Amino acid sequence: MPTFSREEIVHLGDLARIALTDEEITRLQGELNVIADSINKVQEVASDDVPPTANPVPLEAYLRPDVAETPLTQEEALAGGPKTEAGMFVAPRILGSEE
């Protein structure tokens, strides 16, 4: 039964460039050990006579009929937006500042 040491948790945090507090390290150590135990239990149950599967229910992609339709005009498309200018949607700035 593999367990994650504090040093391994710190190393994982360093690899992810995440600064972890002592409390977070302790919590993650417990959580990752529970996950590892769960994976080990599944591996114990899995046997050679059970075929591997990604999904127990076979799913088929539903494709709608490929029918040519008239696209929206620019005016129709812009009518769905709250604010437009010069034929484009106007959205609030989220990065940087105006210079």
UniProtKB/Swiss-Prot annotation:
Entry keyword Repeat: no
Reaction catalysis annotation: L-glutamyl-tRNA(Gln) + L-glutamine + ATP + H2O = L-glutaminyl-tRNA(Gln) + L-glutamate + ADP + phosphate + H(+); L-aspartyl-tRNA(Asn) + L-glutamine + ATP + H2O = L-asparaginyl-tRNA(Asn) + L-glutamate + ADP + phosphate + 2 H(+)
Key words of the record: ATP-binding, Ligase, Nucleotide-binding, Protein biosynthesis
Enzyme Commission number, as recorded: 6.3.5.-
Keyword Ligase carried by entry: yes
A Pfam family recorded for this sequence: GatC
Any one GO molecular-function label of the UniProt entry: ATP binding
Coiled-coil ranges (or none): none
Family to which this protein belongs: Belongs to the GatC family.
Function (record text): Allows the formation of correctly charged Asn-tRNA(Asn) or Gln-tRNA(Gln) through the transamidation of misacylated Asp-tRNA(Asn) or Glu-tRNA(Gln) in organisms which lack either or both of asparaginyl-tRNA or glutaminyl-tRNA synthetases. The reaction takes place in the presence of glutamine and ATP through an activated phospho-Asp-tRNA(Asn) or phospho-Glu-tRNA(Gln).
Subunit structure: Heterotrimer of A, B and C subunits.
Protein name: Aspartyl/glutamyl-tRNA(Asn/Gln) amidotransferase subunit C
Species assigned in the record: Bifidobacterium longum (strain NCC 2705)
Organismal lineage: Bacteria, Bacillati, Actinomycetota, Actinomycetes, Bifidobacteriales
Gene it is expressed from: gatC
